[in-house]
């Protein structure tokens, strides 16, 4: 095996094929528990990243995840979830995966080995200096990710690298390198396991806390949720009910009178103003409810 931590053999699982099911489960669970602690150790560095993503997002910049295989799929997943959760557009948080949409379900031969493909993908979305490009690669040496970070640097965009090794190539190419050493995988080289878990937790933090910073959360409530189905409409009404301390029926009526805009409904009620005035207050206060009701 090579000297990459993500390719090293795990001493705890040398006899995985001889373990009982419960032994294998206990071993995997013990290994998985190491991941959050390793992430805890890099929280100060992650905070610096989120300061940048928040500020750039406020200025019209985008968060662009770029990766291959599992890493790419996790970036695409996080970007996709931002649309219903925070009512972002599909052009505000973007996930690029080597090989394109097809690579979400099947391996696209050679895609991750191409630096030029990353450049083409970033050119296609009109990468600019306001954007933040977050390269994700468990090994820290994926050419597709390296090409993306090089391209971003040339354009003047902010760059972040997330890897699960130490002293990685992508770390050398980024302004904000994040290295999480989760140790060897339970199944040697299968970075969909602990490495993938670490990446998912980190992306959860980046997107969630960035969206808190730009005003898409009130307390711990999703006040910018995009209500695209009955479950989310019901959630929106219950959020209004909770914030405004009114009945469900009152919240539903308020929601309808605000043209199903949760934030507008809340400001209308708490400030005792009409829809037009509520919209103006929100526009004047960067769409942050707490600022709108204070001013």
From Swiss-Prot:
Residues 53-216 form the SIS domain. Its EC number is 4.2.1.126. PROSITE patterns: GCKR, SIS. It catalyses: N-acetyl-D-muramate 6-phosphate + H2O = N-acetyl-D-glucosamine 6-phosphate + (R)-lactate. The active site is at 81 (proton donor), 112. One of its GO terms (molecular function) is carbohydrate derivative binding. Pathway: Amino-sugar metabolism; N-acetylmuramate degradation. It comes from the Bacteria. Keywords: Carbohydrate metabolism, Lyase. One of its GO terms (biological process) is N-acetylmuramic acid catabolic process. It is an enzyme of class 4 (lyase). Specifically catalyzes the cleavage of the D-lactyl ether substituent of MurNAc 6-phosphate, producing GlcNAc 6-phosphate and D-lactate. Homodimer. A lyase-type mechanism (elimination/hydration) is suggested for the cleavage of the lactyl ether bond of MurNAc 6-phosphate, with the formation of an alpha,beta-unsaturated aldehyde intermediate with (E)-stereochemistry, followed by the syn addition of water to give product. Belongs to the GCKR-like family. MurNAc-6-P etherase subfamily. This is N-acetylmuramic acid 6-phosphate etherase. It comes from Staphylococcus saprophyticus subsp. saprophyticus (strain ATCC 15305 / DSM 20229 / NCIMB 8711 / NCTC 7292 / S-41). The lineage of its organism: Bacteria, Bacillati, Bacillota, Bacilli, Bacillales. The gene is murQ.
